[in-house]
Amino acid sequence: MQLHLSASCWLPSVAAVRVYYFHRTVRCGDCLRIDQMSSETLKETFHQELTDGHLEWRPTNLDLPENTHFMFDYDLNANELVVVRDDGKQPVFNKLPEVWELVYHPAKFCSMLIDLVREQLAQPN
């Protein structure tokens, strides 16, 4: 699902693409597994992009007061993995609810995340 945001509900960033894993303070085993698989996939596949600042990985605790706005910014229902493309004009975000179905299928999980991040990184600024 791809949604557009108004410019008023995003935070400026050097990175053109940000990957968020939104979670709560108390997390189940599957929540921790999604966080771990996402982190490892991004670090292994996009090391250079993370290093040079074109990509950011942001696990974010929604229970912290400073992060509650994300619930509205990205229309979050629960713990979610979200890829945000920020061209400086109109941020676009993709929620990945299918991670819950793929949590025990690491190859498919990683492939889905890699494909979406590559697609977003390939977009012109």
Give the residues covered by each predicted segment:
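N-terminal leader/targeting and pre-domain segments
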Residues: 9-15, 119-125
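Structural micro-motif
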Residues: 66, 71-86, 90-92
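N-terminal targeting signals for export/organelle localization
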Residues: 1-5
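Solvent-exposed, acidic/flexible segments
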Residues: 27-31, 35, 64, 102-110
